[in-house]
């Protein structure tokens, strides 16, 4: 896979754009599993899917260049096998079920819509087990905003200082 990019030269008063080419191996494409449950904020879920799916492609589309292969392949993973609605009644159709034990190098826990006195204690035990298994298998686990509450529920933050907003 060949990617064309432009950069500005530092040695001139007025930056000149110079094209260069770099090769990106197709095996660099990474799958990212974004977790969805009914408490997930719909904007966070689909915002992440959109941003991750555009990685490595948006610039080519803007300048009319040939599209390149995707760099990140985001998929929605859920403990629920059927479609459901998440925060603000946004419909979700999971791509993958937790029961299928999917593996990926990246697992993301997006924002949750929880009341200030609400927690996830005892909810989704299979999901919590799966997140721990992914971590133990080498996956990078990321959380956004209140998704850190789900990360804390897994026990992976035990003994660590952590915060959410």
Locate each region found by the language model.
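Extended, subdomain-level signal for the structured scaffold at the beginning of enzyme domains
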Residues: 1-141, 150-153
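A conserved active-site-flanking secondary-structure segment within enzyme catalytic domains
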Residues: 158-165
